[in-house]
Amino acid sequence: MKIAVLRERFEGESRVAATPETIAKYIALGAEVAVEKGAGEASRLSDDDFQKAGATIGATAAATLKGADIVLCVRRPAADELGGVNKGALLVGALDPYGNEKDVAALAKAGVAAMSMEFMPRITRAQVMDILSSQANLAGYQAVIEASKVFDRAMPMMMTAAGTVRPAKAFVMGAGVAGLQAIATAKRLGAVVSATDVRAAAGEQVESLGAKFIMTEALKDASGTGGYARELTKDEQAAQAELVAGH
């Protein structure tokens, strides 16, 4: 079985669909792995790193894909970029199908079976394949780091003989995976943190991280199924907007 790892072509995308560590595991299971030249450069992974793990380096996408049974990607490639794969080859990645029905149909027409990993169910057995949680965790961290750069002042309280710098106040909207990581990161940087969420159950998680939980009394609970929030009514949306604006 041949697994192909493509270089990402989406502007600004710095991730790669497999690392030398995971490739070594695929090879140990008996797979052949081909990585497109330069696929890991934006992630600071050289072609030599992949070769040391046992992968072959394809000079072009076509050479990498030739005879592939599985294609790994971060973002969905165009159907015409998948020439040379075996009929019925499996495309695995964050394929973003909603609103891109024509592109998905083109994949089907090309004879490719697509597996969109962002729809992996949130169940215990699938946790190790939950790409949303892992990426949201990083997004929450990065959001605070980027915000601190824009803020351009000290985040923690600083007391010196020359005076006192008061701590920054951080407000996090949403206490899902990304939000909770943002709260934890802001706290570690020394900010005074508060957060809001439409799910009452999120309050305990927010407070466990040392932040203040803010929730409007007009919205009792908007918890839906699978740990997600349900859609708010117009009145609930207005109440939530008023809460945020006044905080």
Language model features by range: what are they?
Residues 6-45, 154-247:
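Glycine-rich phosphate/diphosphate-binding loop of Rossmann-like nucleotide-binding domains
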Residues 60-83, 148-158, 233-247:
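Electropositive, surface-exposed helix/loop patches at the edges of structured domains
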Residues 76, 138, 176-177:
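Residue-level detector of alpha-helix initiation sites
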